[in-house]
Amino acid sequence: LDPNPEVGPRHAQDVRDAIELGALLGVKRVVTMSGLPADEPGGRRPSWTVEPWHSVFLDARDYQWNEVGIPFWKDIQARAADADVKVCIEMHPHNLVYNPATMERLATEINATHVGAEMDPSHLFWQGIDPVLATEHLGGLVYNAAAKDTRINEAAKLNGVLDDRFGRVAPDDPDALSLGGSYTLSRWPESSSWDFVAVGRGHDVDFWTEFLRALAKVDPDMAVNIEHEDQELDQLEGLRSAAETLKAAASRLG
């Protein structure tokens, strides 16, 4: 949905291609985000409104949903239904769908049968959302799950969780992670308000037990995929922490 012609069309085609390829390979679930349009026709950059307390932001949101987001996702729903592939939306800030309410709105607007949620707790924690409650609330709309943790740091007491002290990474920087076109992943703030961490380093086994329990009520066979973005641990250390925590949590289910 990005208005940049070097970014939006390519990402949109990736989603369509993933659905088609999934059907050919017998893969029944593909994961993506919902995307974010500009705030008006002809806009050049995506625009995300945190709280539309001013009516101008409601105008922007109405355009983003009614003119761009809903038509696109109606088409994706039709393609997914034809292919019998479930499209799992990661509820991620800076997208149209970022919490249970926006997930439900999209599902209602497009009469979803093959578009639902990927339950990734990490993006919910820092918004103050309880992933267990969110899973129970969305129920059958949850198609897939990721295991990634978030730690809320002391700095959140000073700057809150809406901390914008990110830095720019040039596209030609050796550490740059391309997000399409000339876009890159921004540099994380020092003394950040929150961090993504390996499973178990933000929330203990008790939480993960209840999270697995809630997922099992939706679908006992649902895969829970470990996702590693902990900058303080290497990949094997992060995988070990996540696996040990999830195994301990699973052992408590009966």
Language-model region placement:
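Active-site acidic/histidine proton-transfer and metal-coordination neighborhood
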Residues: L1-A117, T209, L236
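A structural motif
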Residues: G22, V27, V142, P220-D221
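Conserved beta-strand positions in the central sheet of alpha/beta enzyme cores
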Residues: V31, Y143-A146, N225
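Flexible loop residues that form catalytic
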Residues: G35, T150, E229
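Acidic/histidine-rich catalytic cores of soluble enzymes
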Residues: D59-R201, G254
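A short, acidic, amphipathic alpha-helical segment used as a generic capping/interface helix at domain edges
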Residues: G202-K217
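A short, acidic, flexible beta-alpha connecting loop/helix-capping segment that sits on the rim
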Residues: A223-G238
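C-terminal helical cap(s) of enzyme catalytic domains, especially alpha/beta-barrels
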Residues: Q235-L253
